Amino acid sequence: MKIPFKQYLYGKEARDKLLAGVNKLADSVAITLGGKGRNVIFESTIFQKPEVTCDGVTIAREGNLEEPFENMGMQLIKQAAFRTNDMAGDGTTTAIVLARELVKAAFELDKGNPVTIKKALYGISLL
């Protein structure tokens, strides 16, 4: 029986990969933000045909990346979008863009110390 190989990343390399995934999703939805927001076209995973939308949660729902660590970053930000959509029914694009900025600030804060980041994000969530 062959045991599957697990890949582990840590430090700057892990942060860079996670941030790359976060940026890919945020860049995709940011252009749809506001009154002058643009449409995004993508291939639907369900119907395997092109789909056009300007809805951030639809774009987030369809987003997946092949690189596993970048995909983890994308999945983390998708959770923020889905929770916002569930609670408010709107604002997913704004939530994704703000979440990206929080992640970037957290990684810069204390060079990515996990305890400091958790405390800072928890403090922000209480506002």
Predicted regions mapped to residue ranges:
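N-terminal glycine-/lysine-enriched basic segments
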Residues: 1-127
